[in-house]
Amino acid sequence: MEIAAETTGPAGVTTDVTNAEESTEQPATRYMQGWALASLTVAFMSICLVLAIDNTILATAIPHITSDFKSLNDIGWYGSSYLIAQMALLPTCGRLYAFYNIKWVYCLSLAIFELGSIIAAVAPNSMSLIIGRAISGLGAAGLVSGTTTILSYCVSLRNQAMLSPIVLGMYNIGSAMGPLIGGSITDNKVLTWRFIFWINLPFGAVALVLVWFTLRKPPPAVKGNLLWVQKLRQLDLPGATLLLGATTCLNLALQWGGIVYPWSDSKVFGCLIGFGLLLITFLCLQWRGKENANIPLRIFRSRTVSASCGFMMLVQVAIVVQSYFWPIYFQSVRNTNARDSGINLLPLIISNSLSTLCAGSLASRFGHYVPFMWVGPLILATGGGLYQLVRPDTPSGKWIGFQILSGVGYGCCSQMPILAVQVVLRKPDIPTGLVMIMFFQMLGGALAPSVGQNLFTDGLLRNLTKVQGIDATAVVAAGASGFRAIVPSELLNAVVDAFNSALRDVFWVGVATPALAWIASWAMEWRQLPDSKKKVTETPAEEGREK
């Protein structure tokens, strides 16, 4: 591969990969250029595209999946299983790149992601689909952390500044394409919804070939010389297992409580107790592990880091709930097909992407990011609150406007926590701070579908019991798009109203969580982005000391 020597050492993905002293003593680092750099960029663009499509393509297919599997109660798990696995294993996967050959770890992560897609595509029942999504989430954790790591190891800072927006821009494109592709595939009687998982394979194959032949001589692992016992200790596998178990228990409680079982039932209560005990054990383990822990607790001594993590989790809950349940409104209440529901979701996705770019540009120009964290949640909450005005016959102009408000609100503020941690933390701590922001963002995304599902199913059952002549359990079992086949025509409007009313309960989450995020934003330190010249040569902490 074509490479060039520079004197700037690459940054790691965790605080124990590099430190301030090491960065000044490292020899010249050889970076990619030319065709090798272009090939790697295309590979990462392909990966970002498939990950983005995979995140959004499922939303428009869920109503059909619930109808095929008679599994309306599993809506939350189709998204949560993927995000829980990705969230819980992200720090551990990130550390694998410090210990082992980055080429092999990345390619193995891609293979695991594709394996999960195959399992989901051939799933004979709902549980198999959930397992496949969880396996894909494990692979995605390795791909997300690996893309950042390989860029820092193999691409100069100057080229990173140019390539990162291009690579990440594919994520926005994929997010917009996902609902359209998912809807079109789901409506096709030949392909069916299963093909939305098969399409991951060609993208992954292209990326695998490019990465494999581009990284013929990958840089050595920065901690490859450690003993296997030391590597195992620093991976903190017990911590990852405890976190995975705690989050699963919480999701089971949210899925069952008040729907499958009463909240007072021993199964639900046991899951909540299990969540509490596992969480306490996990926190104790992180405290004892210090720098070897998955989540170094000392990083949260900074109030900006703590506020940013909480803020990111809360706004993520709001946007994921809306992304998952707007398609259910379109398909169950308005009786649109999956393709059209994907088109109808574009105002939310496009406004989100455009406002993210605009907010980032404005923050970079004026140097302040905190005001966007004040304004964004208020706009996001307004968009969620206005859903209370939505009815089965609401004109399209209104629900398009409501989605645009939500997208603009989220886009205004979603990137600001990432900037904040880079401003307030010392350079060696910045990678860990960024991982924590990603971690809490994924945590919010993992919890959101289950919270929304619980509110939706509980409200739907409650509303259906008021409609005489309707078997509420049968309607729920029929799924979000299949209930019309079993409901008498004279009762259809009442059942549709029951769906719409239940969805209004869900969208209150889109009001409450941004409001809490707005409160959290007031804990942010009022800091300014360093100017571009100082940003190259100094860390934010060093700049602050000079002033």
Curated annotation (Swiss-Prot):
Listed Pfam families: MFS_1 (PF07690)
Region (Disordered): 1-23
Molecular function (Gene Ontology), one example: transmembrane transporter activity
TM spans (from-to): 33-53, 74-94, 104-124, 135-155, 165-185, 195-215, 240-260, 267-287, 310-330, 343-363, 370-390, 399-419, 432-452, 506-526
PROSITE patterns according to UniProt: MFS
Function of the molecule: MFS-type transporter; part of the gene cluster that mediates the biosynthesis of luteodienoside A, a glycosylated polyketide consisting of an unusual 1-O-beta-D-glucopyranosyl-myo-inositol (glucinol) ester of 3-hydroxy-2,2,4-trimethylocta-4,6-dienoic acid. LtbE is probably involved in the secretion of luteodienoside A.
Name this protein carries in UniProt: MFS-type transporter ltbE
Annotated source species: Aspergillus luteorubrus
